[in-house]
């Protein structure tokens, strides 16, 4: 249900505030217990060293603040009957979020052995950061989580991604003041310029200033309040402040701040949805300033702890061996008065549970945090409508991504009412030839517009901001809450999100073994404007290594595709858009490219992942080939086919096999990757003992790494990108990296037995062609006519 001021509750009574405090104290008690205890959860016996874990792990400092936020979110969710989700940026405060899930019952529903009684509490405590237990952060194992928060910077972009196209959802986002110093977080404040108050939900940022990181003060906590206010207002927010260290006063102030913020959200949404307001609203946020490690030990060993950086992790570190630490821990735990919070059986008392919402309204049970439950099949139209006609291989050209743009346009159109598909990118949609989508939807934009602007749309579903971090964060949040999307990016600059994709793959790998986590739509990358066609921008834009990075990740969760033409791109994209729980990387060109395969051939080839192009080679089946010319990627495919044509002309007696690889993981052994080939398959395709000249899109050593255990690896010779780049002609890029057709012919002559002497004159002609290229481009500034005007001639 959307926020509505008619549902705004009155200020909480003293009795209700006492109940909120009881809930907060219970959550704090449970958080401390998880960090320290493995037995005696209710302190029914005096605390002894054997009750304490031998290895103390976890983070206390942020936990009381997270517990405060969770407690007060419970109140407003229940009072206003809200659909809500919370993104916990300080994910190292896992004990707090786990404590609240246990209190509300969602944890027991997910893990029935962790019962809401003394025995279940003991198991909850022992399992935390314990071998065979649960991680220390707000990991995928945590009900209600879409954001682990281990690597900082992405909380707010995840929150906005969750809110897009969920008009009835309120996403609270706790931002630690340490995380607020990261670059991705700093940029993601601008997400409010893209939030549509008509079709999207609301994000309520809660900036938690507890003052310290691991060992240093935080920047924002030390700013004067007026300067901090100016900063946040400059970001487009309307901050509401809560400051204090007295629990009763802070509870009252937090309740008031939550109501104020939600009332403002309701007014913004009502103005946009009912009154037609179109100006960019100033969304509320809460600035919460409470002590780090609040309610914990004030001093330890004579040094201040509470409200200092020393409270960050484990304030009492020698509890098993230091009697004073043990006594201090017991006093700390008993300060929460657990006998008031839990009955004799260990169940939470009614006062603790009074403010907790029911059923799926609970933060740990919301279906929005288990997005696969909400996911619908994406209506991808039949590919035949978009297929380019191919009478003969290489007889025509198309721009592959432009062809894909037509498909994406119609996916956008088919989801107009559903609003569950988005395209994100860092100001590159048109550059990457996908602008056909603008016929179905515009670019999301809530700022003012000028007459020169094009395709801006307050209700658009194309998201463009020049921050790869924010693009990925938006898309991850969108996918994790049950929708579909595609991230289009220049190949060289997708490396900016290397670390983000690490975290997403880890998330997917864990969720695959959690039966209660429903599969989500895959994270799909379209990498274009790639290394071989960045001759105009130069060396800085030439970097094909993202594929290497991805293939280091969990094999069950990553896929890499290098379609060689428009129809194979359509087939790969169709597969990726329909898939679940993967990271799919598609590398494709946007420049005119020869059309090699019909749609039916493309589908079959992509299903195989790698195959012989018999129409391109000269083997007739009467004997094994003399050489295998292999390729992966659009430009390497062009150069391999041009080399095959040269060989056919100059060395017609050679039996040449041409192999194209579209799914690069096929090169791996089947035991190492689900898409890998058996040794029998590999040897059948590449032979066991014949030279293989492999033209690869990226760094050549990746192919060696993938195939190093194969029988014929000693005969494998790979050409690819060798970090030779500049602003030059397209063909000069491949010549500089020894990937050109002439070099490939020379490689064949050098590696097929008997050719070194017999074909020496041919080799010399290839060398001469490379020199002629060198001289020509330096005089004319363009490639040789024999290269620029080259066409494929079918074997006779």
From Swiss-Prot:
The keyword NADP does not apply. Pfam families: XFP, XFP_C, XFP_N. One of its GO terms (molecular function) is aldehyde-lyase activity. Its cofactor is thiamine diphosphate. Its EC number is 4.1.2.-. Keywords: Lyase, Thiamine pyrophosphate. GO terms for biological process: carbohydrate metabolic process. Belongs to the XFP family. NCBIfam families: PRK05261.1-2 (NF003617), PRK05261.1-4 (NF003619), PRK05261.1-6 (NF003621). This is Probable phosphoketolase. It comes from Streptomyces coelicolor (strain ATCC BAA-471 / A3(2) / M145).
């Amino acid at each position: 249900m959307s926020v509505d001021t008619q549902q705004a509750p009155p200020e909480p009574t003293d009795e209700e505030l006492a109940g909120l405090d009881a809930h907060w104290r219970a959550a704090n008690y449970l958080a401390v217990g998880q960090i320290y205890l493995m037995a005696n959860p209710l302190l029914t016996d005096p605390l002894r060293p054997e009750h304490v874990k031998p290895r103390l792990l976890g983070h206390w400092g942020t936990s009381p603040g997270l517990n405060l936020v969770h407690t007060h979110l419970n109140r407003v969710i229940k009072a206003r009957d809200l659909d809500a989700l919370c993104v916990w940026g300080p994910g190292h405060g896992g004990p707090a979020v786990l404590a609240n899930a246990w209190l509300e019952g969602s944890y027991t529903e997910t893990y029935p052995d962790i019962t809401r009684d003394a025995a279940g509490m003991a198991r909850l405590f022992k399992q935390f950061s314990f071998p065979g237990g649960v991680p220390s952060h707000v990991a995928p194992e945590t009900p209600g989580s879409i954001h682990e928060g281990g690597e900082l910077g992405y909380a707010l972009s995840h929150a906005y991604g969750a809110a897009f196209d969920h008009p009835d959802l309120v996403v609270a986002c706790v931002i630690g003041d340490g995380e607020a110093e990261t670059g991705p977080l700093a940029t993601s404040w601008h997400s409010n310029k893209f939030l549509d108050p008509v079709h999207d939900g609301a994000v309520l940022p809660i900036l938690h200033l507890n003052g310290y990181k691991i060992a240093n003060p935080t920047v924002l906590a030390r700013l004067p309040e007026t300067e901090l206010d100016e900063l946040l207002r400059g970001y487009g927010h309307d901050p509401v402040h809560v400051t204090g260290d007295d629990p009763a006063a802070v509870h009252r102030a937090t309740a008031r701040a939550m109501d104020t913020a939600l009332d403002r959200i309701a007014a913004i949404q009502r103005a946009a949805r009912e009154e037609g307001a179109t100006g960019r609203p100033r969304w509320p946020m809460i600035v919460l300033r409470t002590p780090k490690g609040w309610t914990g030990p004030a001093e330890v060993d004579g040094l201040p702890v509470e409200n200092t950086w020393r409270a960050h992790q484990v304030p009492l570190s020698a509890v098993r061996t230091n009697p004073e630490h043990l006594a201090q821990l017991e006093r700390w735990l008993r300060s929460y008065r657990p006998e008031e919070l839990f009955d004799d059986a260990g169940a939470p008392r009614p006062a603790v549970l009074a403010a907790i919402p029911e059923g799926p309204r609970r933060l740990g049970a919301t279906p929005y945090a288990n997005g696969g439950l909400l996911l619908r099949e994406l209506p991808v139209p039949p590919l035949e409508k978009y297929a380019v006609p191919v009478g003969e291989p290489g007889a025509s050209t198309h721009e592959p991504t432009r062809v894909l743009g037509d498909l994406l346009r119609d996916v956008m159109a088919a989801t107009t009412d559903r609003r569950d598909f988005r395209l994100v990118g860092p100001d590159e949609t048109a550059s990457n030839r996908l602008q056909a989508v603008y016929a179905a939807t515009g670019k999301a934009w809530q700022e003012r517009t000028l007459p020169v602007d094009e395709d801006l749309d307050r209700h658009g579903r194309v998201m463009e901001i020049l921050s790869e971090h924010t693009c990925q964060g938006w898309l991850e949040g969108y996918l994790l809450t049950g929708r579909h999307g595609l991230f289009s990016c220049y190949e060289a600059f997708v490396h900016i999100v290397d670390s983000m994709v690490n975290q997403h793959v880890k998330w997917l790998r864990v969720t695959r073994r959690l039966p209660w986590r429903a599969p989500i739509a895959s994270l799909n990358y379209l990498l274009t404007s790639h290394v071989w066609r960045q001759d105009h921008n130069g060396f800085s834009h030439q970097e094909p290594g993202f594929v290497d990075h991805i293939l280091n990740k969990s094999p069950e969760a990553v896929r890499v595709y290098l379609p060689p033409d428009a129809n194979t791109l359509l087939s790969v994209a169709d597969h990726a858009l329909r898939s679940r729980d993967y990271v799919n990387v598609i590398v494709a060109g946007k420049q005119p490219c020869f059309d090699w395969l019909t749609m039916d051939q493309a589908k079959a080839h992509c299903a195989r992942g790698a195959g012989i192009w018999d129409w391109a080679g000269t083997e007739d089946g009467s004997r094994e080939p003399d050489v295998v010319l292999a390729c992966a990627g659009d430009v390497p495919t062009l150069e391999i086919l041009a080399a095959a044509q040269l060989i056919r002309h100059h060395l017609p007696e050679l039996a040449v096999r041409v192999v194209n690889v579209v799914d690069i993981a096929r090169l791996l052994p089947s035991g190492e990757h689900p898409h890998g080939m058996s040794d029998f398959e590999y040897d059948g395709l590449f032979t066991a003992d014949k030279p293989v000249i492999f033209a690869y899109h990226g760094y050549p050593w990746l192919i060696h790494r993938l195939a190093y255990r194969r029988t014929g690896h000693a005969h494998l010779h790979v050409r690819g990108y060798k970090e030779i780049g500049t602003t030059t002609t397209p063909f000069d890029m491949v010549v500089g990296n020894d990937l050109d057709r002439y070099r490939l012919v020379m490689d064949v002559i050098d590696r097929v037995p008997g050719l070194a002497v017999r074909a020496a004159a041919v080799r010399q002609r290839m060398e001469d062609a490379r020199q002629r290229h060198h001289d020509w481009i330096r005089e004319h500034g363009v490639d040789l006519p024999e290269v620029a005007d080259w066409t494929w001639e079918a074997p006779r």
